[in-house]
Amino acid sequence: MPLSLDQRSLQAPWRIVDELIEQPSWGGRYIIDLKGLGSSEQWSGKKVGQSYELSRKAKLFNPADDSKVTLADLIASDPAAVLGAPVLTKFGADISLLIKLTQAKGNSFQVHLPEGKTLGHWEPKPEAWFYLAPGLFTFGIKLDKSFTDFSNALHKIDDCMRRLSDEVKGGQLSLDEAKQKTQELIASVDPYQYVNVVVAEADQIIDLTAGGIHHSWEEDNERFPDGNLVYEVQVDVPDERCSMRGFDKGKFLPDGSLRPTHVADYLATIEQDAEHNELSRHISKPQLLSEQNGAKVESLFRTPYFNLDRISIEAGAEYRDDASGGFHHLFIHAGNAQLGDTKLAQGQSYLIPAATGIYNIAATEKAAIFKTYLPV
């Protein structure tokens, strides 16, 4: 039966149900603490790597009665009122938007397919990052290095790991011995010599929406003990259809098996020209849009797929906006605020339906808010 909602519910913020992803190996406590869950028994002694602040499968609290409603059912109840007529016309009712808060300490060398190109089952996944604190990542390839040598190094590591994995599973080699042999090989071929290793600054923007650009998060526990703290916005595509791993950094699963790698496809997808691998083309800082009456608005992402602004509001000040052209997603990164009768709490996400139209946010304390919306 279709969900039936009165107009008042479609003119109020819908808080998105927390969806935290536990990651014992590379997560941390940042997300737990930001959301005020540090004393929760559920998260005692645990590490979280990501929280999904919006996804196709998201659930939301109905502002009328606090019942939980799926995003799909909410949209189906009145697509134009929820999403906005311009969004429906340009993007349709299936909003493939994924917004994540991430704490990560290293992942594989990856690449995503560029728009307009085809390769097997792979699909593009435009995404962009906003660094909340300093971190470490790799991005793009070095053009003064031999791509053939890079290719040979990755194939050599991958072939060796597959062989060692078979030996561990067959009982000929211990897992520790396989790890040691792998690390010795990685040190000897040094795949990092072929890619740009970048120290991220707080408030740095990384735009990966073009696709075809090598990237990875890195780990340096001495300089960056919290890893990479990143706010991500991306098109919602499952990893198995978009993330090509070229190098998984010598990681074995506990039984000696490996995560899937796709070295040939990864190498075939990387853009090798100077323009695509020019860091200044993809890395930037916030741009001021407006500042008045205690409220500052900065542009973070401007892409064909999604936009992201940061709104900073001084304590006691108000910020005015208009969602009538398309829904807004608000994530409260710092502080607390009030929107009508709804308290906007730090660490929480809210969907502002298009039917809300003009709305005012009053900061009860100094607040920082990320606003994601679609370019219409």
Predicted regions and their residues:
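Conserved short histidine dyad/triad with adjacent acidic residue
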Residues: 107, 111-115, 133, 304-323, ...
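Loop-centered beta-sheet repeat module
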Residues: 179-242
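Short acidic-glycine-tyrosine-enriched beta hairpin
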Residues: 195-207, 338-360
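Ligand-binding loop in jelly-roll beta-barrel domains
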Residues: 102-106, 114-115, 123-124, 133-136, ...
